[in-house]
């Protein structure tokens, strides 16, 4: 199945008239939390540019979960937001601050886009960091289009979220696991865990 809370936001389908290789296309642009724009011909429903099904991480896996082995990646335009997480993405105002951020990150599971949620264990793994967060990337605020230039403007945020999934007490529930929160995590000394910028407006021609 798809990963939780990464479904497209409801209000981010934008009508746009574009010219591709000399051909005028009445298109729809679907802006997503993942930082992708999926572009379709609004008369035929066909993708304007190829959408590739690419293999995505399958581990860690919460017992009982069955994930799709692939996810759709548009070949154009490039992602408008940074995706996935590594130590190079952490706040680095000073070497000491960066080292502290790495120590914080070591408590979590992280990796490329679509890394699955993991079970949080007391004294161990605290969950999987999603980037962009469950709130995006882009979200309900959508995008704006200049009808004369066909440039689309997308506001987005570079943020993280952590779906905290824990094993339940069998005396309290028949469900083996439950999600108790969907918050984020702070970086060292009250700073964000990521390096800036934290918000952008991307113009795509």
What do these predicted ranges mean?
Residues 1-205:
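Beta-sheet-rich non-transmembrane sensory/scaffold domains
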């Amino acid at each position: 199945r798809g990963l939780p809370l990464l479904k497209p936001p409801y209000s981010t389908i934008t009508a746009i008239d574009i010219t591709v290789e000399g051909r005028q296309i009445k298109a729809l642009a679907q802006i997503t939390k993942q930082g992708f724009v999926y572009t379709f011909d609004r008369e035929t429903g066909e993708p304007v540019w190829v959408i590739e099904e690419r293999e995505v991480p399958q581990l860690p896996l919460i017992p009982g979960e069955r994930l799709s082995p692939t996810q759709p990646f548009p070949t154009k335009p490039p992602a408008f937001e940074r995706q996935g997480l590594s130590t190079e993405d952490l706040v680095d105002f000073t070497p000491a601050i960066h080292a502290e951020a790495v120590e914080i990150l070591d408590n979590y599971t992280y990796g490329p886009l679509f890394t699955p949620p993991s079970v949080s264990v007391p004294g161990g793994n605290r969950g999987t960091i999603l980037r962009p967060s469950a709130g995006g990337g882009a979200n309900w605020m959508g995008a704006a289009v200049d009808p004369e230039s066909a440039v689309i403007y997308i506001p987005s945020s570079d943020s993280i979220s952590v779906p905290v999934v824990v094993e339940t007490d069998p005396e309290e529930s028949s469900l083996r696991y439950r999600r108790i929160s969907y918050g984020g995590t702070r970086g060292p000394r009250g700073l964000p865990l990521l390096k800036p910028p934290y918000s952008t407006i991307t113009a795509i021609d």
